[in-house]
From Swiss-Prot:
Cross-referenced InterPro entries: Collagen, Collagen_superfamily, Fib_collagen_C, VWF_dom
Modification 3-hydroxyproline occurs at: P881, P1160, P1175, P1178, P1181
5-hydroxylysine modification, residue list: K261, K426, K501, K747, K858, K1029, K1092, K1104
Protein name: Collagen alpha-1(I) chain
Assigned protein family: Belongs to the fibrillar collagen family.
Species, as recorded: Canis lupus familiaris
């Protein structure tokens, strides 16, 4: 078989041949030298230098690329030191290198870094040279002899294939690079070069007189660079330069061919801890643990049936006052009081509102002339005036400017000849004449004398490259060269030992809130509470808690394996693929909402003053000014004589508080007035009785974050979540490593010579090249160490919105954000509950006087004022009070209805009334504004560790994990045999009750609890701020009796009667009907005033008389006694919350709450199964510089600790054929095991290791199997919580047995009062009784409870039988009475009671009834209950009624509960 290894070997050979060929080709071309400049120093291409100790640079094609030196960890060298000028620590000489030892001890902890060593002494300075004359540059020397050809360092071991096994013992390790010495002084100048060649002749100058040779001039500026010469022949390849440092990361090259299979590598360092192996067989049960932490609150159970009535509660608190009764009939009109004394002058009234604008007044008197206005603008030009008279002749003017020269005159005759001038200067050279014909060759002259040697001519242009000279003789050995630059980077060393764990980082800031998590699984049900005292038998009570688990039964034997089943359902979906390419851009989003209006802009600068406008017309008269303040009061004048009565004035301001009158009879109910303004604050009322419990308030602000709780116990393995949706497309990756150097291109055309530019800065790394063709997939390499975290990439393009993710767990509360911009007003919210009163604010400054308010309602009657000073005698009074009643006149016709009176003027605020009784609780006020968050409370005590979470379902295979460190390969051991089933452990003690769980969602309303005892008095509340005016309410109930109605119109005056003797007070006569109001009669003459007679007997009620005139006001009387208690005032604002009342008696068990909110994420689960090997990781960081090229030396690889002497020849795994064979066996075994496991999932066997979900599943997969005991795991996931059940293979029923199926036959209960028969629950109320638990021996009750919950969900019907053994105890039918009054009660698992008669859904049937009478012999009754409401079964308790006497005994057989 052509293996993968062979293929790789072939490909590697091909790659090597190609590369070697490429190197040979590259050597034939001449690559012009390229230089780099850094810090004023010039370096050649491929030069390497270290500008700083920990930085290394290389000249690469004119670019300086620098990188930080990465030091190897010196793990096995505690005293490592950094030599001066070096970057990396090295072992001092005495330390043992790892290669010297064959075994190493356990690695010690990492030592502290040693102190930095002292700097070495500087080298001695060089000798000063003698300054020489500057020599001329010599010609290029002959090329040196060719260096020995070097092989590429990386290929040496592959080309040599072998390895010198003998040399392994002494693999030499190159020492660290020494520090560079100080720069020496300049050396002596070189000797002057030889005479240069004769330069070409210059152009001929003009012939001058030949002067003497001048001194040598200064050198001219350098000429322009000449054109490039033609290419010379290629020189011999130079010696191989020192290797350059690691280049910058190049663009990714195309994938190379796979190399040959390398030698077997050393054993890697210890790998990261492997994934947890498969769960081992169940160990022996441990000793009972301490009580566990309280469990989380369980899920809300189904609502129970109506519970039995509880015992009567204590008397309730006093109820609220009843509603106000209907108004009584109007009382009789009281007598009018005498006129009072004139009151004192009232205080100045409040300023009235501003009056309406008056009509326009007459035009005012003309005003004073205004000040002169500013000058107006220039007016337009006027019309031209008429011509003036001609003026007199003027004086002569000044002479004018000289005129322009005239035209030239005619030419004059020639003048006489002048004398001859001196000779002119020498003319310029004439243009060169045409060249003459070539003359004959002259005779050879005598050699002239040797001239003075001229100065060397200027350097000629560079000649063409001469032909290659013969190699010269070998020169003397040169002086030792300066220290070479660092070599090229070697292969990366093997991974170092993992360093010690770093210190814990600081706590990070809270992350953003995660997405809402998916709902957690239902928590376990809480433990059963202790039995309460037995109350009177009531109507059915709420369901009781689950009973304790009985001791587990012995485990049954595993059944035999069945035949293979039919193919199973389709497997789970595979791992999600990598994200697809980015989709097309989505449609543009909706237009955003309108933004918040911006803040007002700054006020602009004032404009320039405009020009004054024309004077406007006078304006209309202004409105009347405000009324001036009242002047000071004048001194009081003497009382004048009373004047005649004026017309009735407007209603005066309310007088001072009068004496309280007697309480009038209640008048008819008045119309409901509008709601007045809130009165002044009343005196603190006594605290009212505790009101009913309010609705849950809105959740308060989050408190300050408490101290972190103690870490909870680790939860069991949670299920890995479903794989998330593909994330947004990541940013572009880092550039790939530098590709191989390309072949040299053809020579370009000659460019025009440019000037040398200043060297630019190093350019940025180029963009990534195009992706190479995919190489063949290599074998999965060992995992490399995780690279450092990269910088955060730029945000990618926004992807299309994904589907909503699953809800995340609730995140911690974020920090308070900055206040947002003010939003637009929202819709009016629903009326909130009353907030707690805020703290009283500081007293504000007095506000400005407000507008006059609307008149308030009439104030309450004030208390009596102090008696006023006696006034002057008043004016003559009006007519006195009516005389005694005359005889009744005939009833008059009914008068017309009077108009509704106008609203009275606002009274002054009366003093505070007496504290009223506490009114009924007012309606909730509107929600107060949200108070500012309170100061952080003190940190809470650490919470108790949370309970272990339930194991989650197994998640989908995760994405490939990060590449782990390379581990030592261990061969897998053979699978062990499963251990024997351990004996069952003793059941642990019951744990303490758990803490209260988080509040569940509001359940359906429970039945009313018993009345709580009244709470302690609350402290008085502060006033709430007045609420806004409410909407007009609906008509309220009839109010209390109103004030006495207005008196009717006066009747006619009867004749004065005689004064009768004073009779004794007669009994009150019945109230007569109110007669119709008579018409007003004329006033009769006033009779003389008689003596006051004694009160006569009460006559029949007369017709209502006319209204008398008001009498004079009497002097103020003494204060009256307090009136009767008035009706309750309107309910005051809610006071602050009082202190908590004393605890009420416990209410009935409430219904189970709804599931609480999802808890915080559990502790990190166990490491999941190993994922598939990931793709190769990114290239690791560059390794340290390699040794100089030549051969390849493996000595720099750190030798791992080895047990045997290291065998240098076995570097490569493929060299050992046994390993491959073992590996194949291992793969085969794994595949077989996997296929077996998959088969087990598709067709479960019902064994402990491979349980089915239900017996129905087993029946479908294995229809020919017999009924018997099998293992099932309804909640799937880990099979450690599987339970053993009986499977009825005829029907597919799953039957779960009770842990204690029999109740002994004996006397279980003796009643204190045997005649008073009532149902007594066996498990709850009888001594040594227990509630029935299920699941068989050895099973954990909590596991069984969960499994039963799942089993109920997957079933449509449940049934159970119970056999009641009796002696003198009726179980169902009472033979004596023929009825079912004495029948048993059963309690279902949801605490519902199942009876013998009543609602057919909650009644059981009897298949055999042998307990109908008291015969003194044992009998039995078989009870059966079948239901489609699977939550009612299994039965957990039984209550017989006919027990309690000493001769009454019973026992029970509890049958299995079967689900179908």
């Amino acid at each position: 078989m052509f293996s993968f290894v062979d293929l790789r070997l072939l490909l590697l050979l091909a790659a090597t041949a190609l590369l070697t060929h490429g190197q040979e080709e590259g050597q034939e071309e001449d690559i012009p030298p390229v230089t780099c400049v850094q810090n004023g120093l010039r370096y050649y291409d491929r030069d390497v230098w270290k500008p700083e100790a920990c930085r290394i640079c290389v000249c690469d094609n004119g670019n300086v690329l620098c990188d930080d030196v990465i030091c190897d960890e010196t793990k096995n060298c505690p005293g490592a030191q950094v030599p001066p000028g070096e970057c990396c620590p090295v072992c001092p000489d005495g330390e043992a290198s790892p290669t010297d030892q064959e075994t190493t001890g356990v690695e010690g902890p990492k030592g502290d870094t040693g102190p930095r060593g002292p700097r070495g002494p500087a080298g001695p300075p060089g000798r000063d040279g003698i300054p020489g004359q500057p020599g001329l540059p010599g010609p290029p020397g002959p090329p040196g002899p060719p260096g020995p050809p070097g092989l590429g360092g990386n290929f040496a071991p592959q080309m040599s294939y072998g390895y010198d096994e003998k040399s392994t013992g002494g693999i030499s390790v190159p020492g660290p690079m020494g520090p560079s010495g100080p720069r020496g002084l300049p050396g002596p100048p070189g000797a002057p070069g030889p005479q240069g060649f004769q330069g070409p002749p210059g152009e001929p100058g003009e012939p001058g007189a030949s002067g003497p040779m001048g001194p040598r001039g200064p050198p001219g500026p350098p000429g322009k660079n000449g054109d490039d010469g033609e290419a010379g022949k290629p020189g011999r390849p130079g010696e191989r330069g020192p290797p350059g440092p690691q280049g910058a990361r190049g663009l990714p090259g195309t994938a190379g061919l796979p190399g040959m299979k390398g030698h077997r590598g050393f054993s890697g360092l210890d790998g990261a801890k492997g994934d947890a192996g498969p769960a081992g067989p169940k160990g022996e049960p441990g000793s009972p643990g301490e009580n566990g932490a309280p469990g989380q609150m369980g899920p809300r159970g189904l609502p129970g049936e109506r519970g039995r009535p509880g015992a009567p509660g204590p008397a309730g608190a006093r109820g609220n006052d009843g509603a106000t009764g209907a108004a009584g009939p109007p009382g009789p009109t009281g007598p009018a009081g005498p006129p009072g004394f004139p009151g004192a002058v009232g205080a100045k009234g409040e300023a009235g509102p501003q009056g309406a604008r008056g009509s326009e007044g007459p035009q005012g008197v003309r005003g004073e002339p205004g000040p002169p206005g500013p000058a107006g603008a220039a007016g337009p030009a006027g019309n031209p005036g008429a011509d003036g008279q001609p003026g007199a002749k003027g004086a002569n003017g000044a002479p004018g400017i000289a005129g322009a020269p005239g035209f030239p005159g005619a030419r004059g005759p020639s003048g006489p000849q002048g004398p001859s001038g001196p000779p002119g200067p020498k003319g310029n050279s004439g243009e060169p004449g045409a060249p003459g014909n070539k003359g004959d060759t002259g005779a050879k002259g005598e050699p002239g004398p040797t001239g003075i040697q001229g100065p060397p001519g200027p350097a000629g242009e560079e000649g063409k490259r001469g032909a290659r000279g013969e190699p010269g003789p070998t020169g003397l050995p040169g002086p030792p060269g300066e220290r070479g630059g660092p070599g090229s980077r070697g292969f990366p060393g093997a991974d170092g030992v993992a360093g010690p764990k770093g210190p814990a980082g600081e706590r990070g800031s809270p992350g953003p809130a995660g997405p809402k998590g998916s709902p957690g699984e239902a928590g376990r049900p809480g433990e059963a509470g202790l039995p309460g005292a037995k109350g009177l038998t009531g109507s059915p009570g709420s369901p009781g808690p689950d009973g304790k688990t009985g001791p587990p039964g012995p485990a049954g034997q595993d059944g035999r394996p069945g035949p293979p089943g039919p193919p199973g359902a389709r497997g789970q979906a595979g791992v999600m693929g990598f994200p697809g390419p980015k989709g097309a851009a989505g449609e543009p989003g909706k237009a955003g909402e309108r933004g918040v209006p911006g803040p007002p802009g700054a006020v602009g600068p004032a404009g320039k003053d405009g020009e004054a406008g024309a004077q406007g017309p006078p304006g209309p008269a202004g409105p009347a000014g405000e009324r001036g303040e009242q002047g000071p009061a004048g001194s009081p004048g003497f009382q004048g004589l009373p004047g005649p009565a004026g017309p009735p004035g407007e209603a005066g301001k309310p007088g001072e508080q009068g004496v309280p009158g007697d309480l009038g009879a209640p008048g008819p109910s008045g119309a409901r007035g509008e709601r007045g303004f809130p009165g002044e604050r009343g005196v603190q009322g006594p605290p009212g009785p505790a009101g009913p419990r309010g609705a849950n308030g809105a959740p308060g602000n989050d408190g300050a974050k408490g101290d972190a709780g103690a870490p909870g116990a680790p939860g069991s393995q949670g299920a890995p979540g479903l794989q998330g949706m593909p994330g947004e497309r990541g940013a572009a990756g880092l550039p790939g490593p530098k590709g191989d150097r390309g072949d040299a291109g053809p020579k370009g055309a000659d460019g025009s010579p440019g000037k040398d530019g200043v060297r630019g800065l190093t350019g940025p790394i180029g963009p990534p090249g195009p992706a190479g063709a995919p190489g063949d997939k290599g074998e999965a390499g060992p995992s490399g160490p995780a690279g450092p975290t990269g910088a955060r990439g730029a945000p990618g393009d926004r992807g299309e919105p994904g589907p909503p993710g699953p809800a995340g767990f609730a995140g911690p509360p974020g920090a308070d954000g900055q206040p947002g911009a003010k939003g637009e007003p929202g819709d009016a919210g629903a009326k909130g509950d009353a907030g707690p009163p805020g703290p009283a604010g500081p007293t504000g400054p007095p506000g400005p006087i407000g507008n006059v308010g609307a008149p308030g309602p009439k104030g309450a009657r004030g208390s009596a004022g102090p008696p006023g000073a006696t006034g002057f005698p008043g004016a003559a009074g009006r007519v006195g009070p009516p005389g005694p009643s005359g005889n009744a006149g005939p009833p008059g016709p009914p008068g017309p209805a009077g108009k509704e009176g106008g609203k009275g003027a606002r009274g002054e605020t009366g003093p505070a009334g007496r504290p009223g009784e506490v009114g009924p609780p007012g309606p909730p006020g509107p929600a107060g504004e949200k108070g500012s968050p309170g100061a952080d409370g003190p940190a809470g005590a650490p919470g108790t560790p949370g309970p272990q979470g339930i194991a989650g379902q197994r998640g989908v295979v995760g994405l490939p994990g990060q590449r782990g460190e390379r581990g030592f390969p261990g061969l897998p051991g053979p699978s062990g045999e499963p251990g024997k089933q351990g004996p069952s452990g003793t059941s642990g003690e019951r744990g303490p009750p758990g803490p209260m769980g988080p509040p569940g969602l509001a359940g359906p309303p429970g039945e009313s609890g018993r009345e709580g005892s009244p709470g302690a008095e609350g402290s008085p509340g502060r006033d709430g701020s007045p609420g806004p005016k409410g909407d007009r309410g609906e008509t309220g109930p009839a109010g209390p009796p109103g004030a006495p109605g207005a008196p009717g119109a006066p009747g006619p005056v009867g004749p004065a009667g005689k004064n009768g003797d004073r009779g004794e007070t007669g009994p009150a006569g019945p109230a007569g009907p109110i007669g119709p109001v008579g018409a007003r009669g004329p006033a009769g003459p006033q009779g003389p005033r008689g003596d006051k007679g004694e009160t006569g007997e009460q006559g029949d009620r007369g017709i209502k008389g006319h209204r008398g005139f008001s009498g004079l006001q009497g002097p103020p009387g003494p204060p009256g006694s307090p009136g009767e208690q008035g009706p309750s005032g309107a309910s005051g604002p809610a006071g602050p919350r009082g202190p908590p009342g004393s605890a009420g008696s416990p209410g009935k068990d409430g219904l189970n709450g709804l599931p609480g909110p999802i808890g915080p994420p559990g502790p990190r689960g166990r490491t999941g199964d190993a994922g598939p090997v990931g793709p190769p990781g990114p290239p690791g960081p560059p390794g340290p510089p390699g040794p100089p090229s030549g051969g390849f030396d493996f000595s720099f690889l750190p030798q791992p600790p080895q047990e045997k002497a290291h065998d240098g020849g076995r570097y490569y795994r493929a060299d050992d054929a046994n390993v491959v064979r073992d590996r194949d066996l291992e793969v085969d075994t794994t595949l077989k095991s996997l296929s077996q496991q998959i088969e087990n999932i598709r067709s479960p066997e019902g064994s402990r290791k491979n349980p089915a979900r239900t017996c129905r599943d087993l029946k479908m997969c294995h229809s020919d199997w017999k009924s018997g005991e099998y293992w099932i795991d309804p909640n799937q996931g880990c099979n450690l919580d599987a339970i053993k059940v009986f499977c009825n293979m005829e029907t597919g029923e799953t039957c779960v047995y009770p842990t204690q199926p029999q109740v002994a036959q004996k006397n279980w209960y003796i009643s204190k009062n045997p005649k008073e028969k009532r149902h007594v629950w066996y498990g709850e109320s009888m001594t040594d009784g227990f509630q029935f638990e299920y699941g068989g021996q050895g099973s954990d009750p909590a596991d069984v409870a969960i499994q039963l919950t799942f089993l109920r969900l997957m079933s449509t019907e449940a049934s159970q039988n119970i056999t009641y053994h009796c002696k003198n105890s009726v179980a169902y039918m009472d033979q004596q009475t023929g009825n079912l009054k004495k029948a048993l009660l059963l309690q279902g698992s949801n605490e519902i009671e199942i009876r013998a008669e009543g609602n057919s859904r909650f009644t059981y049937s009897v298949t055999y009834d042998g307990c109908t009478s008291h015969t003194g012999a044992w009998g039995k009754t078989v009870i059966e209950y079948k239901t489609t409401k699977t939550s009612r079964l299994p039965i957990i308790d039984v209550a017989p009624l006919d027990v309690g006497a000493p001769d009454q005994e019973f026992g029970m057989d509890i049958g299995p509960v079967c689900f179908l």
